[in-house]
Amino acid sequence: MKVRPSVKPICEKCKVIKRKGKVMVICSNPKHKQRQG
């Protein structure tokens, strides 16, 4: 899980979602997981 100020999809399987007010990227590749904050 990477925590960074700007989250962007890295590959075509990355999905940008909102959970509890936080913007997150979920992907089948665990290296692509990101959270904003």
Swiss-Prot record:
Keyword Ribonucleoprotein tagged: yes
GO BP terms: translation
Keywords: Ribonucleoprotein, Ribosomal protein
Top-level lineage group: Bacteria
InterPro entries to which the protein is assigned, alphabetical: Ribosomal_bL36, Ribosomal_bL36_sp
GO molecular function, one term: structural constituent of ribosome
CC per GO annotation: cytoplasm; ribonucleoprotein complex; ribosome
Coiled-coil positions: none
NCBIfam families on file: rpmJ_bact
Family that this chain belongs to: Belongs to the bacterial ribosomal protein bL36 family.
Identification of the protein by name: Large ribosomal subunit protein bL36
Organism: Staphylococcus saprophyticus subsp. saprophyticus (strain ATCC 15305 / DSM 20229 / NCIMB 8711 / NCTC 7292 / S-41)
